[in-house]
Amino acid sequence: QCWDISVTGDFAYVGNDDQGLRIIDISNPLIPTLASTFLSTPGVKFEHAQVIDTLAYAATQSGLFILDVSDPAAPVQLGHSPAENGAWSVHVVDTIAYLPKVFEGIRMVNVADPTNPIELGYFQTPDAAYWMEVVDTIAYVAERFSGVQILDISDLTAPDSVGMLSMDYADALYILGDSMYVASSSWGLKQVDISDLTAPVLVNECKGGGYPVDIQAA
């Protein structure tokens, strides 16, 4: 079962549940080949990974793993930040990793030293936090059963809620300028005006078929 995929250069990084993090060579899109698989401990579920330069940050049911993927055929574990009940996704900005933990809120981890990640702060969301995006000092958190919460994270030790968009099934989101695009597994795609962070406004929606749980915009 594949939970999520991210692409960097000629390689795709796939969170493959309890099969680990699979790194796939897609230099020839017609013939993708498995370059390697990283599995820390048998049974640990890998959900999502973000790759920056030669480092991969993987969200798992055992917390955050930081890997050296300079050689995609032989990933090497550098560090691990354990988290009870794990993390659903990971979002790294500068030297901070943000980890939505479903019903256990959001963890913020300093990853300046990949071999020694250090937890900086924590915010308990009122609902299941699945996905988030960070722009400057603002975090947008998709809370699956209640909507999107907007946080001021200028002080990482004490994030503060500044706005909320109520909706059912906010599974993922993407920020583009003053617009936020939200994928909802029940309601399709929603476009939200976030020019006023304290009062986000739904401006458009597309109720297509299927079960959208992720989104990318450009």
Can you name each region flagged by the protein language model?
Residues Q1-A218:
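Feature marking well-ordered beta-strand scaffolds used for ligand recognition
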